[in-house]
C-alpha cells in the first residue's frame, strides 16, 4: 500500500520538479539575456578574447597535424573554463543573428581545414576565416569536439589567455604592416578602399610602433542591437558579421596618430602629417587640410579715422558742388526775371492785350519760351558786333544801340519807307537815354501790333495763289464742289450725285493735298523755331545793352559834376 502511494506521489513530484527545473532554466536564460542587454560594454573584450583563442586553437591544430598521425592524443584543457569562454562568442541576443549561419560554429572549429585557415590569415590579416562545417580531409580524426578535446589541460585559463594574447598581437601587427607595405609598393592610393568581405568582424587600425596590444581591442563597444558603431550609418552587417564601410587609405596615418601616439623611432612615423603644422582630418574622409595661420589684428581706430576723413572730404566736395549749382541757378533765375520784366513789364505796360491776342493764334508766350531751358548763349554768335561795340567808346555805344533794331526796321519796311527810319535813327543821336529807350519801346509795340494782321494778309495771298483742284475740270457742271474741296467741306448730297471714278479722283486729290500740307507744315515749324531763337537772342542783347547803357549813363553823370 505504501509502495503504491509512494509511486503515485513520485510521478507528480517528478513532474513538478521537471517543471520547476525548466522554469528555473528559462529564468536563467532570460537573466542572461537581460544582463547582456544591460551590460553590453563587458561583452566586447570577451568576444575579442574568444576570437584570439579561436585563432590560437587553429594554429595549435595546424602545428599538431603532423604529430596527430603518430600520437593523436590532443592536449588536455579544462573543458569547463575554455568551453565557457568560447561559448561567449555565441551569446544569445534577440537582435544579433546566429554566427552559425556563416559557419562560425565553435564546435566545428576543430574540423576546419588547417591549410585554408592559414592561407586566409596570411592573405588578409583583417579577416576572420569562417569555419567550414564540412569535415577536413587532412585531419586524422575528422571533426574534433573542442570541449572533449581539452579536458585534461591543467594550465590555468588566465595564464593561457595572457600568453596567447601576447603571442598573437605582434604577429597580427606585423602582418598588417606587411600588407600595407605591399599596398604602398603597388601604388594603392584609391580614395575609398573597397568594403571588407562578409567574414570580416573587426576593423583594425595599425599601431605606430608595433606595440604588444592588438588593435581589435580598440573597437568601440557594441550596443544591444548588435552594431559596433551606434551612430555610424556606413557599418554594414552581412549574415551577422560586421563589415565596416571603406575609408580612404590616406587618412590612416592621422587616425592612428589620434588614437595612439606614435613613438619617435617608429618605422611608419613618416606617414603622418608634417611635424611643423597641424593637420585636421575632415569627417568625410578627404585629404588632410592644413590649419590656416591666424589673421593679424586690425587697427580699428586708425581705420575709423581714415573712413571719417574720407567721409569729410566727400561732404566738402558735395557742399562745394551744391554751392556752385546754387550760384549758377541764382544767376539764371535773375536773368530770366530780367527778361520777363523787359518782355512783359516794359513792352506791354499800356496794352498787354496785344501780346495776348497774338498768343491765341498758337504762338507760345515769351515767358514760357524763356523758361523752356533753351541755350541762349548761341544767340550771341548771331550778332557779335554788338558785343564789340559795347566795349568801345560812347559814340560806338550809341551806334550799337541801333544794331538790335535792324531786324525790326527790316520787318517794318513793308509798311514804312527807309527814309523815315533813317531820319528817326539820326534823330535818336541827339536824344537822351531815357527818351531813346521809350521811343524804341513804342516802335516795338507797334511792330508787334502789326504782326498779326500782316500774317493774316500773307496767308490769304498764299491761298489765292494756290492751284485750283483738278476736280473742277472733271466736274464742270458742279463748280461749287471745287470750292467745297478748297474749303474742305463736302455735303452728303453732293457725294451721292458723283460716280465712283469721280469719288476716287477726289480721294486721290485729298491725299496729295495732305502730303503737300504736311511738308509745308514741317517747313513752317522750322521757320518758327528759327524766329523764336532770333527773338530770344534779341532779348538777351537788349538786356545786356540796357545794363551797359545804364552803367555808361551813371558814369557820365558822375563825370559831369566833377567838371
Swiss-Prot record:
Ranges annotated as biased composition (Polar residues): 88-97, 318-331, 400-411
Chain residue ranges for the region called Required for interaction with ankyrins: 419-563
S-S bridge residues: none
Coiled-coil region list: 500-534
GO terms (BP aspect): negative regulation of cytoskeleton organization; positive regulation of hippo signaling
Region Disordered, annotated ranges: 63-150, 164-295, 312-336, 384-430
Tissue expr: Highly expressed in brain and to a lower extent in heart and kidney.
PTM-bearing positions, type Phosphoserine: 193
Compositionally biased intervals (Acidic residues): 168-182, 420-430
Keywords carried by this UniProt record: Cell projection, Coiled coil, Cytoplasm, Phosphoprotein
Chief location of this protein within or outside the cell: other
Domain IQ: 47-67
Biased composition (Low complexity): 76-87, 108-143
Gene Ontology CC annotations of this record: axon initial segment; cell junction; cytoplasm; plasma membrane
Basic and acidic residues biased stretches: 183-199, 229-238, 385-399
InterPro entries cross-referenced by the UniProt entry: IQCJ-SCHIP1_N, SCHIP_1, SCHIP_1_C
Pfam family membership, one: SCHIP-1_C
Protein's cellular compartments: Cell projection, Axon; Cytoplasm
Complex formation: Homooligomer (via coiled coil domain). Interacts (via IQ domain) with calmodulin; the interaction is direct and lost in presence of calcium. Interacts with ANK3 (via ANK repeats); required for localization at axon initial segments (AIS) and nodes of Ranvier. Interacts with SPTBN4. Interacts with KCNQ2 and KCNQ3.
Role description: May play a role in action potential conduction in myelinated cells through the organization of molecular complexes at nodes of Ranvier and axon initial segments. May also play a role in axon outgrowth and guidance.
Annotated protein name in UniProt: IQCJ-SCHIP1 readthrough transcript protein
Organism of origin: Homo sapiens (Human)
Amino acid at each position: 500500500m505504501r509502495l503504491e502511494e509512494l509511486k503515485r506521489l513520485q510521478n507528480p513530484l517528478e513532474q513538478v520538479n521537471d517543471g520547476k527545473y525548466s522554469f528555473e532554466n528559462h529564468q536563467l536564460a532570460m537573466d542572461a539575456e537581460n544582463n547582456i542587454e544591460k551590460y553590453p560594454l563587458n561583452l566586447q573584450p570577451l568576444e575579442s578574447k574568444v576570437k584570439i583563442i579561436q585563432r590560437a586553437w587553429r594554429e595549435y591544430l595546424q602545428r599538431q597535424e603532423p604529430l596527430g598521425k603518430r600520437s593523436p592524443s590532443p592536449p588536455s584543457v579544462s573543458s569547463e573554463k575554455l568551453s565557457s569562454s568560447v561559448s561567449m562568442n555565441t551569446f544569445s541576443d534577440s537582435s544579433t543573428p546566429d554566427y552559425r549561419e556563416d559557419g562560425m560554429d565553435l564546435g566545428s572549429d576543430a574540423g576546419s581545414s588547417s591549410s585554408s585557415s592559414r592561407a586566409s590569415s596570411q592573405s588578409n590579416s583583417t579577416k576572420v576565416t569562417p569555419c567550414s562545417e564540412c569535415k577536413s580531409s587532412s585531419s586524422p580524426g575528422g571533426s574534433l569536439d573542442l570541449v572533449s578535446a581539452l579536458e585534461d589541460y591543467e594550465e590555468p585559463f588566465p595564464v593561457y589567455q595572457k600568453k596567447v594574447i601576447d603571442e598573437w598581437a605582434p604577429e597580427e601587427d606585423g602582418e598588417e604592416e606587411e600588407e600595407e607595405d605591399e599596398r604602398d609598393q603597388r601604388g594603392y592610393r584609391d580614395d575609398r578602399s573597397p568594403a571588407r568581405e562578409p567574414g570580416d568582424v573587426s576593423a583594425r587600425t595599425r599601431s605606430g610602433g608595433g606595440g604588444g596590444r592588438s588593435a581589435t581591442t580598440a573597437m568601440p563597444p557594441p550596443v544591444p542591437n548588435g552594431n559596433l558603431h551606434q551612430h555610424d550609418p556606413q557599418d554594414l552587417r552581412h549574415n551577422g558579421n560586421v563589415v565596416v564601410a571603406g575609408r580612404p587609405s590616406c587618412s590612416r596615418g592621422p587616425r592612428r596618430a589620434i588614437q595612439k601616439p606614435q613613438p619617435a623611432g617608429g618605422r611608419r612615423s613618416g606617414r603622418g602629417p608634417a611635424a611643423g603644422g597641424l593637420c585636421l582630418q575632415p569627417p568625410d574622409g578627404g585629404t588632410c587640410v592644413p590649419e590656416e595661420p591666424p589673421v593679424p589684428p586690425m587697427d580699428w581706430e586708425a581705420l575709423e579715422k581714415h573712413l571719417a576723413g574720407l567721409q569729410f572730404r566727400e561732404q566738402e566736395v558735395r557742399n562745394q558742388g551744391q554751392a556752385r549749382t546754387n550760384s549758377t541757378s541764382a544767376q539764371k533765375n535773375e536773368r530770366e526775371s530780367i527778361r520777363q520784366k523787359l518782355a512783359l513789364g516794359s513792352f506791354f505796360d499800356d496794352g498787354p492785350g496785344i501780346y495776348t491776342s497774338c498768343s491765341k493764334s498758337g504762338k507760345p508766350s515769351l515767358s514760357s519760351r524763356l523758361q523752356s531751358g533753351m541755350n541762349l548763349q548761341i544767340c550771341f554768335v548771331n550778332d557779335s558786333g554788338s558785343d564789340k561795340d559795347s566795349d568801345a567808346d560812347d559814340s560806338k555805344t550809341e551806334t550799337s544801340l541801333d544794331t538790335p533794331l535792324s531786324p525790326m526796321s527790316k520787318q517794318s519796311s513793308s509798311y514804312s519807307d527807309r527814309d523815315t527810319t533813317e531820319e528817326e535813327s539820326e534823330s535818336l543821336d541827339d536824344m537822351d537815354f531815357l527818351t531813346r529807350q521809350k521811343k524804341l519801346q513804342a516802335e516795338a509795340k507797334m511792330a508787334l501790333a502789326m504782326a498779326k494782321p500782316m500774317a493774316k494778309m500773307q496767308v490769304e495771298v498764299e491761298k489765292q495763289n494756290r492751284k485750283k483742284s483738278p476736280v473742277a475740270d472733271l466736274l464742270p457742271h458742279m463748280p461749287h464742289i471745287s470750292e467745297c474741296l478748297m474749303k474742305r467741306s463736302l455735303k452728303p448730297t453732293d457725294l451721292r450725285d458723283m460716280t465712283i471714278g469721280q469719288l476716287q479722283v477726289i480721294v486721290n486729290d485729298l491725299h496729295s493735298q495732305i502730303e503737300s500740307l504736311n511738308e509745308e507744315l514741317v517747313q513752317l515749324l522750322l521757320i518758327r523755331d528759327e524766329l523764336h531763337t532770333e527773338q530770344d537772342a534779341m532779348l538777351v542783347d537788349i538786356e545786356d545793352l540796357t545794363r551797359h547803357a545804364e552803367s555808361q549813363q551813371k558814369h557820365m553823370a558822375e563825370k559831369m559834376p566833377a567838371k
